Amino acid sequence: MPVYRDEGVVLRTAPLAEADRIITVLTRRTGRVRAVAKGVRKTSSRFGSRLEPGTYVDLLLHSGRALDTVTQADIISPYGATIAVDYPRYTAAAVMLETAERLTSEERQPALRLFLLLVGGLRTLAGDERPPALVLDAFLLRALAVSGYGMALDHCARCGGPGLHLSLSVPGGGVVCPQCRPHGAASVSAGAVRLLADLLRGDWDGALVSDARARREAGGIAAAYLQWHLERGLRALPYLERA
């Protein structure tokens, strides 16, 4: 397909030569693609600010050997620009975008569920109706789940025994019962486990009544679990502001 149309979220940009940029986009149908936007850094560029990180765009692209080329871009929703005015939301979005890129390790592999989660997460951040940290943690847990790394929260990750288990093994895949608890497993609070479970299944009524301590603990667990499966840290995570 020499020329194709797709919609996607801009994950990252990088300068190329004097006036161009390489953009990385998670698309609805094609998965993660990289493409050159020629002349985008010129003040007279026809693309304007349409290809900034976090922007949801409709794209017309020309396929290339190593990189595609953007020939047309129209904004569907300027999530990135809306979110950027608020630092906690901006840093949460930055972690989302980097996570989406890292979870799509291969280019041109469709990842529709991850794409829909990312669009939904950015839309929620832009709406500013829920705490950014909770929106981020919900995205991280669900993104890991659709990528095959779901965290066990309502049953033992080892034996499958149901219940509210208060030991966590990140390498083991989630909470574990007393009989299966491995050496080095961490103790976690019931509030944090319940909050993580609420976020994973989208129970916002339950999540929003959680207290600040449970939110901090749950956020740390979600970040640790993510980075374990990514096998290295996220560049954006140290800048995250959990307001």
From Swiss-Prot:
GO term, biological process aspect, one: DNA recombination
Keyword DNA repair: yes
Keywords linked to the UniProt accession: DNA damage, DNA recombination, DNA repair
Name of one Pfam family that matches: RecO_C
The UniProt record lists the keyword Membrane: no
SUPFAM superfamilies: ArfGap/RecO-like zinc finger, Nucleic acid-binding proteins
Entries under Gene3D superfamilies matching the protein: Nucleic acid-binding proteins, Recombination protein O, C-terminal domain
Residue runs in coiled coils: none
An example Gene Ontology CC term for this record: bacterial nucleoid
InterPro entries with a match to the protein in the record: ARFGAP/RecO, DNA_rep/recomb_RecO_N, NA-bd_OB-fold, RecO, RecO_C
Family assignment from sequence similarity: Belongs to the RecO family.
Reported function: Involved in DNA repair and RecF pathway recombination.
HAMAP family: RecO (MF_00201)
UniProt name for this protein: DNA repair protein RecO
Provenance organism: Frankia casuarinae (strain DSM 45818 / CECT 9043 / HFP020203 / CcI3)
Gene expressing this chain: recO
